[in-house]
UniProtKB/Swiss-Prot annotation:
Location of the active site: 126 (proton acceptor), 128 (nucleophile)
Gene Ontology biological process terms in this record: riboflavin biosynthetic process
Gene that produces this protein: ribA
InterPro entries hit by this protein: GTP_cyclohydro_II, RibA, RibA-like_sf
Function text: Catalyzes the conversion of GTP to 2,5-diamino-6-ribosylamino-4(3H)-pyrimidinone 5'-phosphate (DARP), formate and pyrophosphate.
Pathway: Cofactor biosynthesis; riboflavin biosynthesis; 5-amino-6-(D-ribitylamino)uracil from GTP: step 1/4
The organism's taxonomic lineage, starting at the top: Bacteria, Pseudomonadati, Pseudomonadota, Gammaproteobacteria, Alteromonadales
Binding site for GTP: 49-53, 70, 92-94, 114, 149, 154
Catalytic activity, EC: 3.5.4.25
Superkingdom classification of source: Bacteria
Protein name per the record: GTP cyclohydrolase-2
Catalysed conversion reaction: GTP + 4 H2O = 2,5-diamino-6-hydroxy-4-(5-phosphoribosylamino)-pyrimidine + formate + 2 phosphate + 3 H(+)
Sorted UniProt keywords: GTP-binding, Hydrolase, Metal-binding, Nucleotide-binding, Riboflavin biosynthesis, Zinc
Length: 209
């Protein structure tokens, strides 16, 4: 495994002080981060999330996706729980990178959905891999998880690496008029587990101009 632990530091946030653990992939040069909160109870399932980098949603407040909303909600949920973790993986644009993501957005502006846009650019709908989580989970000392996700691929990935997913915790937040079609495509074509109302009703607070 090419993932190497580098260092840890405190990370004050609006929800409390997390611990930030840095990792480097010597093969790809990518730098991944694990956030932990609180003291983990031995042998207990820990609330957590695998979150792939989304610069537009996480840092630029884009309403085209639900990523930033999911990240903030996950951090808030963990703080309220008193313990938990987030693995922040550098897999922008479901693994195609930032510039290709912008190219995909350009195609979406012309009418393609998120899956069609990736495929027109020559990519699979979802290019992400999750093998880098193995040493990250070992480092933070977690092997039983209550996983915050709507994506069954993340559940299967954890299970395939010998991690026990005790519970899948839905994370259905961030719906608005700009991402309604995106959420529906994630549900109908990518297999994300979302309730019908999540991608058919518009958030009136976001809908105001």
């Amino acid at each position: 495994m090419s993932i190497k632990y580098i260092a840890s530091s405190k990370l004050p946030t609006p929800w409390g002080v997390f611990e930030m653990h840095g990792f480097e992939d010597s093969e790809t040069g990518k730098e991944h981060v694990a956030l932990t909160f609180g003291t983990f109870t031995p042998d207990a399932p820990i609330l957590g999330r695998i979150h792939s980098e989304c610069l537009t949603g996480d840092a630029l407040f884009s309403l085209r996706c639900d990523c930033g909303f999911q990240l903030q909600t996950a951090m808030q949920n963990i703080a309220e729980e008193g313990q938990g973790f987030i693995l922040y993986l550098r897999q922008e644009g479901r693994g195609i990178g930032l510039l290709n993501k912008i190219r995909a957005y350009e195609l979406q502006d012309q009418g393609a959905n998120t899956v069609e846009a990736n495929e027109r650019l020559g990519f699979e709908a979802d290019m992400r891999k999750y093998d880098m989580i193995i040493p990250m989970m070992e480092k933070i000392g977690v092997d039983k998880v209550r996983l915050m996700t709507n994506n069954p691929r993340k559940v299967k990935a954890m299970q395939s690496f010998g991690l026990e997913v005790v519970e899948r915790v839905p994370l259905q937040v961030g719906k608005n008029r700009y991402n309604e079609g995106y959420l529906k495509t994630k549900s109908t074509q990518l297999g994300h587990m979302m309730s019908e109302h999540h991608f058919t009703e518009t958030d009136p607070e976001v809908d105001k101009d």
